[in-house]
Every structure is written in C-alpha cells, then in structure tokens.
C-alpha cells in the first residue's frame, strides 16, 4: 500500500478532494475529523483543560481562538494531540494494508513534520481569492482566525515545492477530475 498525504492551505479544497476519493472507493483518513472525534472523549477534554487552564470550560471555538492567538497554548495542545493523531493514523494505515492506495488529509502535514508517515505528498492549491470565497461560506468562519492560520501555515508555494504532486482545485469539475485521474495513474505506477 502507498500512503498518500494530502495537504494544502485553509479552504484550498483538501476535504473536497478527500471526499471525492472516498466516493471513488479509496480508503481515506481526515485529521480534522479524527481530532473532532478525539475531542468528544470526556477524559481527553479534562486533560486539555489541565494543559490549557486559560479555558474555563471545554469549547472548540474557545480552543480555536486561544491557539490561534497564543503560540505557547497552540504548542502545548499540539504536543498533546499530535501523538494521539499519529496513533490513529498508524492504525488507519495498518487496517488498510491490503489496498493499493490510502489517502490522508493532514492540513499541517509539513508544519507538524508528518511527511515521514507518507510515501508521497499531494498539495492541493488554488488562488487566494478562491480560498477566501470558500472560507466565508463556512459557518465557523472568522476572518481573524483565517488570517492567523495563513500566518502559521507554510505558503502554498512552499507546500507545492515540497510536495511530490500538486492539484489545482481552482478549476471546473471536469478539469479537477482529469487532474485526480492523472494523479491516481501516476501513483498506481509506483505501487
């Protein structure tokens, strides 16, 4: 099995492409969904409240505001949550060894040094204008958090340069499907 990491900037189309691949029958893992599942655990919530005493109670929106405005709090949370995420990722890979390809969406793949867990990395990208258009349609959109995420993440250009493959998601569906089909063919040649 080839483990493929999918990354990209905020609102670049990562989840859309991951869902597309899932609908086509490929095994997929989403770091954001995994973390949301982890956050449902009461014991884990209590541990996070101990790590981040600034939080009066467990609330994902409050956590987002805190970690995007406090570098130390963000680092503490990442140091706690990343090992749990890695365990889930490794389990996903073990459970899917019989498949040719398995795709994992990891938004901060390079920033978190997760590239070591993948055979290949694909960066999803599009223009800043399209990313902003997509972002403002999200219920949880906050311009301050959006700007802070941009500061924290590597630039799209850096992610494209580091990646083995890249896909421009700022195109029509037909062109996007062509890019995904080409990616799959390129990857299947390497299995």
From Swiss-Prot:
Pfam families referenced in this protein's UniProt entry, alphabetically: CoaE (PF01121)
Compartments, as annotated in UniProt: Cytoplasm
Gene Ontology CC terms, in alphabetical order: cytoplasm
Biological processes per GO annotation: coenzyme A biosynthetic process
Pathway annotation: Cofactor biosynthesis; coenzyme A biosynthesis; CoA from (R)-pantothenate: step 5/5
Entry keyword set: ATP-binding, Coenzyme A biosynthesis, Cytoplasm, Kinase, Nucleotide-binding, Transferase
An MF annotation (GO) of this entry: ATP binding
Record-linked SUPFAM superfamilies: P-loop containing nucleoside triphosphate hydrolases
Listed name of the protein: Dephospho-CoA kinase
Organism listed in the record: Rickettsia prowazekii (strain Madrid E)
């Amino acid at each position: 099995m080839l483990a493929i990491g999918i990354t990209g900037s905020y609102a670049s189309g990562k989840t859309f492409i991951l869902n597309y691949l899932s609908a086509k029958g490929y095994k997929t893992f989403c770091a954001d969904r995994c973390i949301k599942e982890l956050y449902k655990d009461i014991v884990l919530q209590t541990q996070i409240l101990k790590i981040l005493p600034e939080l009066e109670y467990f609330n994902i929106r409050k956590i987002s505001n805190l970690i995007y405005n406090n570098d130390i709090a963000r680092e503490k949370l990442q140091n706690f949550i990343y090992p749990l995420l890695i365990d889930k990722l490794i389990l996903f890979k073990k459970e899917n060894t019989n498949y040719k390809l398995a795709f994992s969406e990891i938004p901060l793949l390079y920033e978190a040094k997760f590239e070591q867990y993948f055979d290949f990395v694909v960066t999803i990208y599009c223009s800043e204008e399209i990313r902003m258009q997509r972002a403002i349609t999200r219920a949880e959109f906050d311009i301050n958090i959006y700007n802070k995420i941009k500061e924290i993440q590597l630039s799209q250009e850096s992610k494209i340069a580091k990646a083995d493959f890249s896909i421009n998601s700022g195109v029509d569906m037909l062109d996007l499907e062509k890019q995904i089909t080409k990616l799959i063919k390129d990857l299947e040649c390497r299995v």
